[in-house]
């Protein structure tokens, strides 16, 4: 019976892809971002306030100012957009969208716990939560008023309890790595029972590759040991298997970079003379191009929907970089280097 959920039909895929196409058409274009790069912060907020973000800018404008207004409005819009995507989908598409968006459960857990550790007011954390995963906003609001021990206890009986139970005995960055490992591990347990599911799982595995190659390069640059690197990687990649990762982690950085050139994600990547953050943006661009190509190859599938989900998050990230950069007077060229614009 579960395989029937995965199969769906052409008409069902055509419907959700058509809805997604309309939503995708409303995303800001590269020329919009280049226009925004020539504006001052207040002009940027006014400009964004006339786009898809108007509702959130208007609603939160009385509560926040400056880049915090932008942050909260962007995350609120992201949550609303993803919830709408779930609402208009059904069958196989709804199942897969919801599974993928469980990533935001991890985001919310991390932000709530980090907020508790830093004594941030619950209402401030509340505004950056994205209730797009398995749990609804009511659940996250109940956690906001609990202490860390009670929050951890709330996840007893779930896969996330294991990494969360180590809070206090391990660094928070390791807890975060553990939470994302659980998220991907649970996704990879899905059975590739038909072509729709295989496309979804290949997408997930390729996303893991992108995360892992970033981790490899970042930790190598920090002179981490092979064991330290492996602790931070996520098993189950598309080409970067655990065995491959172990070999790469043990290589000197120059040799490792040479070895990486044969993998799918190294197409047109230029890293010479670049800082790690700039290299990570190169891989983000490769990932977006790859998703776009695969979505075009399989237009009646989950891939165009996943492409939109990724592009929407990239748009929000770009607007945050732009807003904070302009607010603090960074040169436009420096801000643009930190953005993912194709």
From Swiss-Prot:
SUPFAM superfamilies: V-type ATP synthase subunit C. The keyword Secreted does not apply. GO terms for cellular component: plasma membrane; proton-transporting V-type ATPase, V0 domain. Its main location: membrane. One of its GO terms (biological process) is proton motive force-driven plasma membrane ATP synthesis. It comes from the Archaea. Transmembrane segments: none annotated. Has multiple subunits with at least A(3), B(3), C, D, E, F, H, I and proteolipid K(x). This is A-type ATP synthase subunit C. The gene is atpC.
